[in-house]
């Protein structure tokens, strides 16, 4: 990429020992922001521990475009949300490369009385959105276009009712509709008509947060969600650390044979905490959890593993990196992630290209990857403007001298402090989010 310098990924022959504080969850932050905006008729909401990154700043900017007031209170991670839904004529929402903005806000815009245009990065135009837009149209919403850029012609209300949608490409289709469903006149029933919904824990997170905001949701029937009409309550939201962003750091403990501790790990979470721990245990790590932290102790040498990542697809790049630097000859199978071909980039093709480009053995399957660990050599690891790909390259680089990551700055999508936190971890310092404790 022109104008982008490569970042020399640090390597280490010695075990990594570090304690880290990870900034807030992107998934929780952006859901809390949307719910806080929808609750403004009831009052002002506050959010503590919010993630500040490109994705969350895009959400804040988009909500401001729609007329809401979102401001920092004391620190960047403490927010107040007020105002109301009142986009100006000609309003244009910039989605960037944020799937949550792209999929959560068209239903909100439909409740306004203005026409709102949505657009984003060039790469975002390949991200799936047509099923969500078709679902809104079936509810009577007027929409021009079936992909970016498109316009939502708000008429002040949405009738609601039952919508059938194929969400096999993204669980965010379901979450995006549910978040606004209580404000539809008749509420909303969503019926998923396709194959299994990927990243199901994120749908469960949406349901849980809606209930925390006083919204009645019935999810007792598989592939069917009913949101009763009613108010969204204004309240205070506390955001957990982003457990997905913790995985590269925990992986550093695995591949180096060291021990990495993440403070503030929640005892109970709507994030896929249990899945993360189970995956790390599959590679022979010892996982210890207390009321205040999670610690992973690695073995440096470990065998291959077989794992279904359908519900936690965002972890695939990091898990693929773990597989690539396992004991040479170890075979790992990553399954259930065909939907990753529609993420920030085609992550399966990208992982295969980058691992093979460093001398590894990675083959695509219909729904995942088969990786045979092999001695790797240095070279450029391309990020594809994908934060998870860049972080995966850093894991590979720990065990492979001479790896350079193209566009490490793309990690700003969810963790702007990543390069400094990675360096601090390897320097034996305590790596923390600059806002922690402020």
Curated annotation (Swiss-Prot):
Disulfide bonds: none
InterPro entries cross-referenced by the UniProt entry: Enolpyruvate_Tfrase_dom, Enolpyruvate_Tfrase_sf, EPSP_synthase, EPSP_synthase_CS, RNA3'P_cycl/enolpyr_Trfase_a/b
Descriptive protein name: 3-phosphoshikimate 1-carboxyvinyltransferase
An example Gene Ontology molecular-function term: 3-phosphoshikimate 1-carboxyvinyltransferase activity
Alphabetically ordered keywords of this record: Amino-acid biosynthesis, Aromatic amino acid biosynthesis, Cytoplasm, Transferase
Organism: Mycobacterium sp. (strain JLS)
Claim: Amino-acid biosynthesis is one of the keywords in the record: yes
Main subcellular location of this protein, as a coarse class: cytoplasm
Keyword Transferase: yes
Function: Catalyzes the transfer of the enolpyruvyl moiety of phosphoenolpyruvate (PEP) to the 5-hydroxyl of shikimate-3-phosphate (S3P) to produce enolpyruvyl shikimate-3-phosphate and inorganic phosphate.
Pathway: Metabolic intermediate biosynthesis; chorismate biosynthesis; chorismate from D-erythrose 4-phosphate and phosphoenolpyruvate: step 6/7
């Amino acid at each position: 990429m022109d104008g982008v310098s490569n970042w020399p990924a640090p390597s280490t022959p010695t075990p990594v020992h570090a304690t880290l504080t990870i900034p807030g969850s992107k998934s929780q932050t952006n859901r809390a922001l949307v719910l806080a905006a929808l609750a403004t008729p009831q009052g002002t909401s506050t959010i503590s521990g919010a993630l500040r990154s490109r994705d969350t700043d895009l959400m804040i900017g988009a909500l401001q475009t729609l007329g809401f007031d979102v401001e920092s209170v004391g620190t960047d991670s403490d927010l107040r949300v007020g105002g109301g839904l009142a986009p100006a004529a000609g309003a244009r929402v910039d989605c960037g490369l944020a799937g949550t903005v792209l999929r959560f806000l068209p239903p909100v815009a439909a409740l306004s009385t203005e026409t709102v245009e949505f657009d984003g990065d060039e790469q975002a135009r390949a991200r799936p959105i047509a099923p969500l837009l078709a679902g809104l149209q079936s509810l009577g919403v007027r929409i021009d276009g079936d992909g970016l850029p498109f316009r939502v012609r708000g008429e002040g209300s949405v009738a609601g009712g039952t919508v059938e949608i194929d969400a096999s490409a993204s669980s965010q289709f379901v979450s995006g509709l549910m978040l606004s469903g209580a404000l539809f006149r008749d509420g909303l029933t969503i019926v998923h008509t396709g194959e299994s919904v990927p990243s199901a824990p994120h749908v469960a997170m949406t349901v849980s947060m809606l209930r925390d905001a006083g919204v009645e949701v019935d999810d007792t029937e598989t592939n069917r969600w009913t949101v009763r009409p009613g108010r969204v309550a204004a309240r205070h939201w506390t955001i957990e650390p982003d457990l997905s962003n913790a995985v590269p750091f925990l992986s550093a403990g695995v591949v180096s044979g060291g021990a990495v501790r993440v403070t503030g790990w929640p005892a109970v979470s709507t994030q896929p905490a249990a899945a993360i721990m189970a995956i790390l245990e599959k590679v022979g790590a010892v996982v210890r959890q207390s009321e205040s932290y999670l610690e992973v102790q690695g073995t440096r040498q470990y065998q291959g593993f077989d794992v279904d990542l359908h519900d936690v697809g965002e972890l695939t790049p990091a898990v693929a990196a773990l597989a690539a630097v396992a004991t040479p000859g170890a075979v790992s199978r990553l399954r259930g992630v065909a939907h990753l071909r529609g993420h920030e980039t085609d992550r399966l093709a990208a992982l295969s290209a980058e691992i093979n480009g460093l001398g590894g053995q990675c083959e695509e399957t219909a729904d995942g990857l088969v990786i045979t660990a092999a001695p790797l050599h240095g070279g450029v690891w391309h990020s594809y403007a994908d934060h998870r790909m860049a972080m995966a390259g850093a894991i590979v680089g720990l065990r492979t001298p001479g790896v350079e990551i193209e566009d490490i700055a793309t990690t700003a999508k969810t963790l702007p402090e990543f390069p400094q936190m990675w360096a601090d971890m390897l320097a034996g310092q305590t790596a923390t989010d600059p806002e922690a404790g402020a």
